[in-house]
């Protein structure tokens, strides 16, 4: 069974594109991390006129209309929040606290968990770093299942609580992802016979990504996470209370901030759901700015199909109301798409688009 790490072996990274700077030791923003002050790439550029007053809809998953609302939000925005999601707040606090413990360590200790050049898991900067001229004000820790291999390098005798919290969180996030995906398919009128549901669920490709955006001497100069779309079906994001920074891009509106809402999780559509829905659901472009003088933490759970699964527009979706709708994408295995994205980032989607 292919793994995500195997998909990355063809695109190994240099250590300079893995190991973050020592954020504790910088007194001013280095040139390497200073983004343009104007232009499309500028972190300062917020086109949204009324963005500050916009709040992303929160859908109560226990509501009788939840399926309709989730489907509608996927179609119109590609991003929404959910409440009554079943993830205990005690678990969210515990994962936050474990993540803080890790990111508060000195740089020399964190680097013991460093991601390998062709690997997918461990400590490091965002994998898309080589595609940009400047570095991001960000450090991350990625895991797929048990983080034991990395955690025990960091805490040889005290990794138990960290691993336990991360594994429990991933189990519950997986169940929530399946619940959301089932709701979305139901909204689309897709039955479990229309797609290979048992196989889709049997060995899903998923990852938990802890993100840390350290305090910055001049937040307006740096980019937390550069604009991107997520690769898999969907992402479920928890933002630690008061520290906001996530923004998504809306046509005609610009960058819209997503303020953390107590008890709510952010869900966004990724490339693979965009492909399977035959472009009905947008794979939402988002970024993170470090606009506050405080350390920000978030936890993203990425949920996708197994590595050898073929993603393509769902056949049944193209035969609605007696009319044949043309497929907008050719189908591709998850592994090939992940590799294509590792080599081409945002160009990957257009490479499989049928014109
Ligand atoms: C990501 C991401 C947003 C955030 O990890 O892909 O978009 O708020 N994170 O940290
Ligand atoms: Ni993302």
Regions found by a protein language model. Name each.
Residues 1-355:
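Peripheral, non-catalytic segments flanking oxidoreductase cores
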């Amino acid at each position: 069974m292919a793994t995500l790490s195997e998909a990355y072996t063809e695109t190994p990274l240099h250590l300079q594109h893995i190991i973050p700077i020592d954020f504790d030791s910088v007194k001013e923003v280095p040139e390497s991390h200073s983004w343009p002050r104007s232009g499309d790439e500028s972190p300062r550029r917020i086109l949204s006129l009324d963005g500050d007053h916009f709040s992303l809809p929160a859908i109560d998953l226990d509501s009788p209309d939840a399926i309709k609302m989730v489907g509608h939000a996927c179609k119109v925005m590609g991003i929404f929040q959910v409440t009554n999601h079943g993830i205990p707040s005690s678990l969210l606090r515990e994962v936050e606290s474990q993540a803080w413990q890790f990111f508060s360590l000195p740089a020399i200790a964190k680097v013991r968990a460093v991601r390998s050049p062709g690997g997918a898991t461990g400590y490091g900067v965002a994998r898309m770093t080589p595609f940009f001229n400047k570095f991001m004000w960000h450090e991350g820790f990625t895991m797929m299942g048990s983080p034991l291999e990395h955690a025990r390098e960091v805490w040889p005798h005290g990794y138990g609580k960290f691993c336990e919290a991360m594994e429990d969180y991933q189990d519950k996030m997986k169940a929530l992802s399946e619940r959301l995906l089932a709701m979305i398919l139901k909204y689309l009128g897709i039955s479990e016979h229309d797609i290979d549901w048992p196989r889709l669920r049997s060995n899903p490709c998923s990852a938990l990504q802890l993100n840390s955006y350290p305090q910055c001497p001049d937040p307006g100069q740096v980019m937390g996470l550069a604009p991107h779309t997520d690769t898999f079906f969907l992402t479920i994001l928890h933002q630690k209370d008061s520290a906001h920074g996530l923004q998504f891009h809306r046509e005609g509106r610009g960058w819209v901030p997503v303020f953390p809402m107590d008890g709510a999780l952010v869900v966004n559509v990724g490339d693979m759901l965009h492909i399977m829905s035959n472009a009905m659901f947008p794979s939402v472009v988002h970024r993170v700015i470090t606009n506050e003088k405080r350390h920000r933490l978030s936890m993203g759970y990425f949920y996708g199909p197994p590595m050898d699964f073929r993603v393509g527009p769902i056949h049944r979706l193209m035969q609605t109301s007696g009319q044949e709708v043309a497929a907008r994408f050719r189908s591709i295995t998850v592994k090939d798409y992940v590799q294509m994205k590792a080599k081409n980032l945002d160009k990957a989607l257009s490479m499989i688009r049928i014109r």
